[in-house]
Amino acid sequence: MIIDLPSTTTSKVNKKLVELRETGGAVALGRVLTLAIITDDGAQAEEAIAAANEASREHPCRVVLIAKGARRAAARLDAQIRIGGDAGASEVIMLRLYGPLADEGASCLVPLLLPDAPVVAWWPYETPKVPAEDPIGRLAHRRITDAKSERNPVKALEHRAAVYADGDTDLAWTRLTSWRALLATALDLPPHEKVESATVTGRADSPSTTLLAAWLASALGVPVTRVRAQDGQGIVSVVLQRRSGQIVLERPNGQFATLTQPGQPDRRLTLHRRSIRDCLIEELRRLDPDEIYSQTLQALPKVEGGSAGASTSRRGTGSRTRTKTATAGKSAGRAGGKTTARTAAAAPAATSPVAGTGTTRSRRTAEPKPSRRGSTAAARSRSRAKNGEDTAGEQG
């Protein structure tokens, strides 16, 4: 049931709620909290109400949506009450504020609060600079924001850390619950070795990727690198480096993940991207300060930025390791060749030169012997037979 109350007051809205309770049997005695949603009028308001209705099936509450309308219009309050099937397990009160009233959301909210019930404020889109100092934020026990909706999500997280107050939380943090649980479970399995470093890969505009990297830096106390991914959605992969090998949790498609651990078969896991409904339900379960979230925000400066497009999957890391090994081998070979040349220069002239070093040969031997090519060819054959041993060392 939807009841429209155009050009009304909060007093008339309260009277209408009492009337509906008496005639229709809609009661507010079972409501556990008041959820205040602050957003602009339009499609965004309906999306927020839909998510709140779904969340109310687990947390019956009174939803008061404060929709800010045109500020140049005349001062006016339009209200709408939704109960029954249109409100899930809650009762929804939508307040559309126009003109000067658009900035008086707290004054309109107070008369509609449930008595002796906690208040949760949710800004699904535009967020005040300091939520705890906002007029509605002062009324709330919990203040929910969403850095994902900001123009610069990562910078928004840094601002959240600077103005954090007990009761603040962000849905970018709530989206990490499944990732944190899987990583913690993987570390609980043997071998119980210390993590040496970690790498988190995700899209550049993913605040959850940055928060996950900060959480690992805070919880493990190890260097953590945040790498930007060109493909994928949100968080793509996490690599934990230990002495025995890597723990890799990779989700390339945003739905299913693969957990790889040394000495164990790969495991395919369901790791869907969490909806607003799921995140809101989780946040409404607790009204106390989130200390882990606070510590994670303070650990943001510890995260090292990564190069764009780099990959942290197990295969990618292995290829980089092989490349580094090959490069080191070439460098060692060159160094060995130079040492052999210097040693041969100090030796008698009869000592055979290193294959392919014509300059060294001319310095060591003024008059080359006729059999030099044969000796060099034989040295090359012996070098191949011994799988890459140094020719000069073999002849010496």
Model-based region annotation:
Residues M1-A121:
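An N-terminal, globular interaction/scaffold subdomain
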Residues V63-R71, W122-P124, A147-K148, P223-G234:
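A generic structural motif
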Residues L95-A184:
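Internal, hydrophobic cores of structured domains that mediate oligomerization or house catalytic pockets
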Residues A172-V227, S237:
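ATP/pyrophosphate-binding catalytic subdomain of soluble kinases
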